[in-house]
Amino acid sequence: MNIIVTGGAGFIGSNFIFHMLDKYPDYRIVCLDCLTYAGNLSTLEPVMDNPNFRFVKESITDRDAVYKLFEEEHPDMVVNFAAESHVDRSIENPQVFLDTNIIGTSVLMDACRKYGIKRYHQVSTDEVYGDLPLDRPDLFFHEDTPIHTSSPYSSSKAAADLLVLAYHRTYGLPVTISRCSNNYGPYHFPEKLIPLMIANALNDKPLPVYGTGENVRDWLYVEDHCKAIDLIIHNGRVGEVYNVGGHNEKTNLEIVKIICRELDKPDRKSTRLNSSHAR
């Protein structure tokens, strides 16, 4: 099996590459990543000498580069992690999110059509569903929950998902989509909630919590997410959307308190920021 993994130098993508090379030593994994601020090539250092791994620095928006890679590698499958994913950044500069998340996805699917891949998998987010009511902790998102986006980021991911499904219905492209809740674990980008709180607590810095801190998120360990994608790309039904979650709901304030407790730090008051957009 020859798999192109886009965005593989990022947090979830790199963990997925490690998982796949460890579980399937005969698979060939090609990482396509343009190394934006969220990508870190040193993350992939443990697999750089693996003969079944190749890294290519290119953007999924570069049609010529993508087609050239497909011609060289003849992939059986594409797993697309490549995305701009920070909500606040999408509010400041939405265009780059449209370019990468929508145009980049269309380039990949056109390449998949042209070169006849066996499966295209789109890694999406539960943010396309919007927010659950704070007073209804018993509710969960389902695959048939209506899309209700709240930022340029989530809108761009929802648009990409719809485009992927349209390519399946129009051209018969064999696709699957996964929408996951918040991940945590190794190589998490430091601007995200959990690594930021850990770093600040260790250095006795303020712990910035957005809004009231009562926003509820479902948290999933990144390796569990990788296992879910592995299962979907090998056994999932073409044309289906799969939600991936941990049923591990915590408010942001609960997360901060857990981190302070585990680090044996005093339960200091959090700094409230006037924003509800950061994840």
Please identify what each model-predicted range represents.
Residues 47, 135-136, 190-198, 259:
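A glycine/serine/threonine-rich, flexible loop-to-helix segment
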